[in-house]
Amino acid sequence: MDKNWSISLEHEEYVMDMELVITDAIDAVEKTGKGYYVNVVTPASFGNPNDYLADALLAYFGGRIEMKFIDQCGCGGYVLRVWKNN
């Protein structure tokens, strides 16, 4: 995707399935074009994505991405912004 975008992984099947959150976050980053970012919105049930998702993304993508924790949403979920470098 050659634009900045967001994906919501915070409701329904994601709330109790951390593996699904990680798998779909990896897929979202893969679909993001070089030079753009995806805001990955994660469930409140798993807490701050820096504690579980950031490590998984770094293990998969290495230096091809940069990440920044943005904030906790008013709805309770969390936003992790992931930039695709190449």
Residue ranges and their predicted role:
Residues 59-86:
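C-terminal edge-of-domain segments
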Residues 1-34:
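An N-terminal amphipathic alpha-helical segment
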Residues 27-69:
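Short, hydrophobic/π-rich interface segment
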